[in-house]
Amino acid sequence: MAKEHGAMRSVLNLIGSVMLPQDTSNCSDRHDTPSAPEFLSHLQPFQTVLLSIASFSTTIVLCLSLIHWFYVYKYVSIEKRRNKLYWLIAVFPVACSCSFIAMCVPRTAVILTCIGVLYYLMCLFVIVSLARHLFGGRESFSTCLQYDDRPIDFRSPPFCCIIPKLPTARSTEKNIRRLEWCVLQAPIVRSIIIFLDVVAVAEMREDATPYIRYSDMASLCSLLLAIFGVHTLARVTSNKLSAYCFMSMFRLVDISLLFFSAQQPMIFQNVLLRFNLISCGPLLNAQENAYFVCNFIITCEMLLLSVLATWLLAPRHNAMFDAYRPSMALSETTASLNETEQSMILDH
């Protein structure tokens, strides 16, 4: 029994070292993370440039989100649909703002990342809820899929997609509800873990690191389950909701979640920091410099995705904006009538 317990602990430590590698940087002096006034008054030249670009990117993203909000408010007539879209509109500005604030206030980098991921997880459930709404409810959702003989295919990311043969399931209300719960559990679990982490840090200080590592592994498992659930549902609905640009909307949120949550642990921690490719600075250690650069990259990525969303989800080819097409038809009719009147006048 003791041998099995030791093996399990070794496996957990190995997974933890992959997720949160130890700081192997050769910083000569150890110091506390600087406050925002201290950091902003002693910026290095490259940090000034990155902050300037990040502030510009964040401003553009916020302006684009206001434009998106206006179009949803004006051209989406169904209030329930509007309220769901408001959540999704805020994805890019929330991620961009969290990253920019974390650049300016280094002490908040970890907590703002947690808050940003929590918002993303809530938006994943909003996407599932939006798909159910567009079908007219869960019963109609299930009936439509069964009528088209579309079973639930479990070969979805992050891991099941590499398994060649998996059994399918009937698209019943019960199975759809189970997939919805796979997505809904993620924000609930993340909220509980954030609360427990705050309590652990407040009570145990530096000794809370092992507990935070295990809680991060639990939240990662919860996140992967949510990604599996939302991908499985999205793939089933892709053909039926193409007029609403649903898959484009889902892919944009999915890719931005990947950028926001996976770059820091996978690229910066497990590659750049592990091999000492990011060094210490006068005020920030290697880990904090990694967060700074990663947050800058996220602001740029959110700007690109926001511009892409403006083009891909435009009302002119998106049935989600149900009040936009009648106005277009009215304007086209008015234009044709004016042309007819002018031709009649010229004939006379």
UniProtKB/Swiss-Prot annotation:
The keyword Glycoprotein applies. Its main location: membrane. GO terms for molecular function: transmembrane transporter activity. Keywords: Cell membrane, Glycoprotein, Membrane, Transmembrane, Transmembrane helix, Transport. It is a multi-pass membrane protein. InterPro entries: Ostalpha/TMEM184C (IPR005178). GO terms for cellular component: membrane; plasma membrane. Residues 71-84, 131-180, 235-240, 313-348 are cytoplasmic. Glycans are attached at N26. It holds the Pfam family Solute_trans_a. The chain crosses the membrane at residues 50-70, 85-105, 110-130, 181-201, 214-234, 241-261, 292-312. It is found in: Cell membrane. Disulfide bonds: none annotated. The keyword Membrane applies. Probable transporter. Belongs to the OST-alpha family. PANTHER family: ORGANIC SOLUTE TRANSPORTER-RELATED. This is Organic solute transporter alpha-like protein 3. It comes from Caenorhabditis elegans. The lineage of its organism: Eukaryota, Metazoa, Ecdysozoa, Nematoda, Chromadorea.
